[in-house]
Regions:
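Conserved alpha/beta-hydrolase
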Residues: 73-101
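Alpha/beta-hydrolase active-site loop
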Residues: 74, 107-130
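Short, surface-exposed "cap/lid" segments of acyl-processing enzymes
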Residues: 43-82
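Short beta-strand/loop motif that positions the catalytic acidic residue
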Residues: 236, 242-244
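Accessory cap/linker subdomain of secreted extracellular hydrolases
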Residues: 159-235
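Short, small-residue-biased leader/transition segments that mark boundaries at the very start
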Residues: 1-5
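N-terminal cap/lid segment of alpha/beta-hydrolase-fold proteins
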Residues: 9-45, 49
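Primarily recognizes the serine-hydrolase "nucleophile elbow" in alpha/beta-hydrolase
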Residues: 124-180
Length: 248
């Protein structure tokens, strides 16, 4: 379908509407089909493309989370804004989320590497599009770590962009988020994290921590904890842009 957006320059003066095109795209995986949308500017070829990877939890391709009220459509607006500047984009629903729900595994079988593999699959998909002059990977929140790992040793990627990505391993962030909890809770979290970092499942999780450390999600967390963004980013051989705000 075609959309029309109005671009406003820094001067605040209204500009002519920018015509762009949006079409559905699919990626076949071993567990099912991932669905997304590609937005292209109103030109035949020679434009760069940004692969937009959404953040953690039930966040869809538009940046909306089923766990939060309302819709912000942040990633959809990003795609439209990029197109207005002559930059294409591809954004997608992660496996198990929204239109890609059928590609989801059961929670116990999920691994952080699944997301990395999917991102690389989309990069391969884009690399076959002769209209594109270069592929850039953008990840938001947890998607920043996924995109970072997918860009390492990948000659098809020309640049990497982190938007509100973590600069520390996930277990450190989780423990920091517990700073306001009673000491007994903080100690339990540290103890569970120590086991998970060692690759050990924790069978007896207190009821109050089940939402975070339930048995079905522990294998995913074990795989997630092995990724340290401070070490992975050193392996990137492409230009890197890090965007971070004062508030999450």
């Amino acid at each position: 379908r075609q959309m029309c957006i109005r671009d406003r320059s820094l001067s605040g003066l209204p500009q002519l509407p920018v015509r762009l095109n949006e079409r559905p795209v699919v990626l076949n995986t071993s567990t099912g089909v991932l669905k997304g949308k590609m937005v292209t500017p109103n030109q035949e070829s020679g434009y760069p493309v940004v692969l937009i990877i959404p953040g953690s939890g039930p966040t869809d391709m538009d940046g909306n989370s089923a766990a939060l009220p309302g819709k912000n459509n942040s990633l959809r607006y990003l795609a439209e804004g990029l197109a207005g500047k002559g930059i294409a984009s591809l954004r997608y629903d992660k496996r198990g989320i929204a239109s890609s729900a059928s590609a989801g595994k059961d929670e116990y079988s999920m691994r952080f590497e699944d997301g990395i593999k999917d991102a690389r699959g989309w990069i391969d998909y884009l690399s076959k599009d002769k209209r594109i002059s270069g592929i850039y990977v953008l990840g938001h929140s947890e998607g920043a770590l996924v995109g970072m790992a997918a860009s390492v040793d990948n000659p098809k990627v020309k640049g990497y962009i982190s938007v509100a990505g973590a600069g520390r391993p996930a277990y450190e962030i989780i423990e920091e988020q517990m700073a306001g909890q009673p000491e007994v809770i903080r100690n339990m979290v540290r103890s569970i994290n120590t086991s998970l970092k060692e690759g050990k499942l924790v069978p007896d999780v207190p009821i109050g921590l089940q939402a975070l450390f339930r048995s079905s999600v522990q294998p995913y967390m074990i795989s997630w904890y092995t990724y340290n963004p401070q070490e992975i980013i050193k392996k990137l051989k492409v230009p890197v842009l890090i965007l971070q705000g004062d508030k999450d």
